[in-house]
Amino acid sequence: MLNWAIDGFWGYSVSEVVLYLLVVTHITIVSVTVYLHRFSAHRSILLGPVIAHFFRFWLWLTTGQVTREWTAVHRKHHAECESLDDPHSPVKQGLPKILWNGVEVYKSAIADEETLSRYGKGCPED
């Protein structure tokens, strides 16, 4: 453990590890914003197959995110915004629940096959 503190993780310095983590995190955030949100959920941009596949693969690799599930939950959120049927409404479910139990809220939403079939149309089957 002392060697890691002195030599860094696999021989990389702390600043190199931090830089790597920042770059990987940024690519993941851009992938969610561009691919899942703009391209898949709202269809507000067009992406070529190569870049779409890159984003899809990156999200699978870094988050395990399934495109159809994320898209369906997001579309339902817009369709049922701030109602009892909104899958992640901080107004109806409370902000602390969404912030601290967001994964459980999301898993509950994707467990509903009707949500996936109704709002996940046009998405790839990951």
What is each model feature region?
Residues 1-126:
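Non-catalytic, topology-defining segments of multipass membrane proteins
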